[in-house]
């Protein structure tokens, strides 16, 4: 019998080892296949070329992490990292082979995030100041797409097209009635009269304070938009506001009359504009000048960025500035590649602190906040990092609440005028299923050694004593938050109280009240980090977290399977509302703080393109 078990165990481990070997060989084969399929030829750039900024490609801080299926099949959504876009445009301004830039809005306008687009806009203005022409052409310009197109020397539009200038709006969703119908009870605790993050679960509309701050914030971001567009188009803010109030969506001929565009035309005349700007155009009548499959010489931003990397001399020995991207909700534990896990980022920052080649760090925060515990774990690692090397905070579209908590550990804070930040406040949401149990005929009994033994249970609502305990915890976390902000920003208790209470600020307003040091984008923060570290002109940037390699994707999917959930296909008029509902529930699912206390933005805005 003993030999039987020994043989069985040996057979089991032998089989397991064989499976591991086969999987390894299979994974290696897939890697080699992927490399062969995805290999690209060395890029080539000819004279008289136009750089293309495609408004159909979203611009985000970092490229998304792909699934194995997306990596192998190449069906991933195309996304441009912000630094890729800005660096490519700025380098193209100095490259004699690039003679013009085309802002292409023919497909759709998917660009998003006013703060990120402000940095792209500044790069476009520098390109134009170099003496090179920018031409914009589109079918339908969204408000965000037009924000970039307005920088062009010439804006052209298809005769069937239009321009959207109708202002900013938000339509928050409230779950209170739905939760009540489902039998789910909600009890909330918060500190800060403006901390409205609990309102979707307790109210059926916005509180006066939350409505006031959202209205003020929208107005400020809108004024920044109007001022920028007015300056670029030689219009006035009152003119644009009148267009937004009275017309909103302008057909091509009306947009021309209102001087939002310069010409209503078709694609062939766009080619004529590019030719006038010096771009080589394929002429069918001149056989000697024809180039196969080319209307004109062009290169995309992604291709040009790859070309620059290929042509640039390797400087591996230069001191490094690390850019650490913190994007998404802040969650307890390691999290996923779509959010900011406190433990995972804590480890990453420790690794960077111990790397002697890294002389300075930029934390790029694009987060509405989340778990207070996770934010504090990251804050501590930033504090330790700052003690050894300069840490500059760069705020993206939003860096609020838990995102601002982390930012207080940096040496300097840089934000765009239209960044959403602040929201210094905390809250807790306590759900219970007592009514749901009644409806389903479920009953619970209780045995305990004391009145507070089952304080963590969600079976029934919290008692007054239990609520008092939770409120004490919320108050304590808020005091910790205030202390960090007060010490970091050198604010008196009175000044601190006036900027806290969960109130949200634009970057421009935040600078005025002392929450932000300097206005600018990611490159501003990088340059500041280099100056603080006294690196001179010779340094290089290294970005974190590094993308997952294909091997990691392969093993993960060999274990969990290659299947992906198919999304529901909905008509356009339902899709927006369904996506909003999905986002809200997905964000609620990330509420995993061990104490149930959160430092998070009190609303979730998504400015959608038509």
Curated annotation (Swiss-Prot):
The active site is at 195 (proton donor/acceptor), 401 (nucleophile). Residues 38-610 are periplasmic. Its main location: membrane. GO terms for biological process: signal peptide processing. Digests cleaved signal peptides in vitro, its in vivo function is unknown. This activity is necessary to maintain proper secretion of mature proteins across the membrane. Belongs to the peptidase S49 family. This is Protease 4. It comes from Synechocystis sp. (strain ATCC 27184 / PCC 6803 / Kazusa). The gene is sppA.
């Amino acid at each position: 019998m003993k030999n039987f078990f020994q043989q069985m165990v040996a057979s089991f481990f032998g089989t397991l080892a064989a499976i591991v070997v086969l999987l390894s060989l299979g994974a290696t084969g897939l890697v080699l296949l992927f490399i062969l399929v995805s290999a690209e030829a060395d890029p080539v750039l000819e004279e008289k070329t136009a750089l293309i900024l495609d408004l159909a490609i979203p611009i985000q801080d970092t490229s998304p992490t792909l699934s194995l299926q997306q990596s192998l099949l190449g069906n991933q959504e195309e996304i441009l990292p912000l630094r890729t876009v800005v660096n490519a445009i700025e380098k193209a301004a100095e490259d004699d082979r690039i003679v013009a830039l085309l802002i292409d809005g023919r497909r759709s306008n998917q660009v998003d995030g006013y703060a990120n687009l402000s940095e792209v806009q500044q790069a476009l203005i520098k390109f134009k100041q170099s003496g090179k022409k920018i031409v914009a052409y589109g079918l339908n310009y969204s408000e965000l797409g037009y924000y970039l197109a307005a920088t062009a020397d010439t804006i052209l539009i298809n005769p069937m097209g239009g321009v959207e200038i109708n202002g900013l709006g938000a339509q928050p969703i409230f779950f209170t009635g739905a939760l009540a119908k489902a039998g789910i009870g909600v009890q909330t605790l918060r500190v800060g009269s403006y901390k409205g993050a609990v309102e979707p679960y307790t109210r059926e509309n916005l509180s006066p304070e939350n409505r006031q701050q959202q209205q003020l914030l929208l107005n400020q971001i809108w004024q920044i938009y109007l001022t920028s567009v007015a300056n670029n188009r030689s219009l006035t803010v009152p003119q644009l506001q009148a267009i937004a109030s009275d017309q909103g969506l302008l057909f091509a001929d009306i947009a021309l009359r209102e001087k939002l565009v310069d010409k209503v035309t078709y694609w062939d005349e766009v080619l004529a504009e590019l030719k006038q700007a010096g771009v080589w155009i394929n002429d069918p009548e001149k056989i000697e000048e024809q180039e196969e499959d080319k209307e004109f010489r062009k290169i995309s931003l992604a291709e040009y960025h790859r070309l620059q990397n290929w042509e640039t001399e390797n400087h591996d020995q230069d001191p490094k500035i690390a850019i650490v991207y913190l994007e998404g909700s802040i969650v307890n534990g390691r999290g996923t590649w779509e959010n900011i896990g406190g433990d995972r980022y804590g480890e990453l920052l420790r690794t960077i602190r111990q790397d002697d080649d890294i002389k300075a760090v930029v934390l790029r925060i694009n987060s509405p906040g989340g778990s207070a515990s996770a934010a504090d774990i990251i804050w501590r690692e930033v504090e330790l990092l700052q003690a050894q090397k300069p840490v500059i905070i760069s705020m993206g579209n939003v860096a609020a609440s838990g995102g601002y908590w982390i930012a207080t550990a940096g040496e300097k804070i840089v934000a765009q005028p239209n960044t959403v930040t602040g929201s210094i406040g905390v809250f807790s949401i306590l759900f219970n299923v007592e009514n749901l149990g009644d409806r389903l005929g479920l009953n619970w009994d209780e045995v305990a050694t004391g009145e507070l033994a089952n304080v963590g249970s969600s079976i029934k609502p919290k008692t007054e004593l239990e609520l008092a305990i939770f409120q004490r915890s919320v108050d304590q976390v808020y005091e910790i938050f205030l202390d960090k902000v007060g010490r970091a920003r050198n604010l008196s208790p009175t000044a601190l109280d006036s900027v806290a209470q969960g109130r949200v600020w634009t970057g421009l307003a935040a600078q005025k009240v002392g929450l932000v040091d300097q206005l600018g984008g990611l490159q501003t923060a990088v340059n500041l980090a280099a100056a603080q570290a006294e690196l001179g002109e010779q340094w290089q940037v290294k970005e974190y977290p590094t993308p997952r390699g294909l091997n990691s994707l392969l093993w993960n999917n060999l274990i969990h399977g290659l299947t992906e959930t198919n999304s529901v296909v909905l008509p356009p008029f339902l899709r927006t509302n369904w996506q909003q509902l999905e986002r809200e529930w997905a964000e609620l699912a990330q509420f995993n703080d061990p104490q149930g206390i959160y430092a998070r933005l009190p609303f979730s805005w998504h400015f959608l393109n038509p």
